[in-house]
Regions:
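Glycine-rich phosphate/ribose-binding loops and adjacent secondary-structure elements
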Residues: 51-52, 59, 70-72, 86, ...
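A short acidic (Asp/Glu
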Residues: 28-34, 69-72, 99-104, 126-127
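A compositional/structural signature marking long, glycine- and acidic/polar-rich segments
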Residues: 57, 61-80
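Short, well-structured secondary-structure segments
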Residues: 1-63
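Active-site-adjacent pocket scaffolds in enzyme catalytic domains
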Residues: 1-11, 38, 42-46, 78-181
Length: 182
């Protein structure tokens, strides 16, 4: 049920797509999917990088990587060793992310963009803005070399968090898109 890449390729064939790929060791129930130790995942990454509409293949840190710096380094090294990956953007688990910690870590790793700021059980912009903004280290009192891209909605929030059927989710997403496009 998780293999929707062909469907997504077809639906977005004329649009640039950012793919966020989990390269974590399998850790049920949170990090499941393709085994990063097998050739199939790096092959998928290469295939996604050749998307007709363009786009990037970016790293999605696993559940354990958010708390453990060694796991984080191992995963990032693994992911970025594969051809055709984008080192400039990440998207971590919403519920596990801590901006005060993670933004500093991403900057130190050379990541320039983070798309991890969003709601796991609701829609809307967690930072109060739909526009990208520069991250700031409150404790260190300095701007960071990291741009934050707020996420307006996640599929699981629409289905499980809000209990919306696909038709309702489509209506609400259309409304949200019209608000931010003004």
């Amino acid at each position: 049920p998780y293999d929707t890449y062909g469907f997504l390729h077809e639906v977005h064939r004329r649009e640039a797509v950012s793919w966020f790929i989990l390269a974590a060791d399998r850790n049920r129930p949170f990090d499941i999917g393709l085994n990063p130790k097998l050739d199939v995942l790096p092959s998928l990454v290469e295939s996604l990088s050749n998307h007709p509409g363009g786009g990037d293949v970016c790293w999605h840190p696993g559940y354990k990587a958010v708390d453990d710096a060694h796991v984080c380094q191992h995963e990032s090294d693994r992911f970025w060793s594969w051809t055709s990956t984008n080192r400039n953007m990440v998207r971590a688990h919403f519920l596990r992310s801590e901006p005060s910690r993670d933004w500093i870590r991403w900057e130190a790793m050379g990541v320039a963009h983070d798309a991890s700021l969003g709601w796991a059980r609701d829609v809307g912009f967690r930072a109060g803005t739909s526009r990208p903004f520069q991250a700031y280290d409150v404790e260190g009192e300095r701007p960071l070399a990291l741009t934050i891209h707020s996420v307006a909605a996640m599929d699981s929030a629409l289905k499980e968090g809000l209990g919306w059927r696909p038709e309702r989710a489509a209506e609400e997403m259309d409304r949200l898109i019209s608000v931010v496009s003004e």
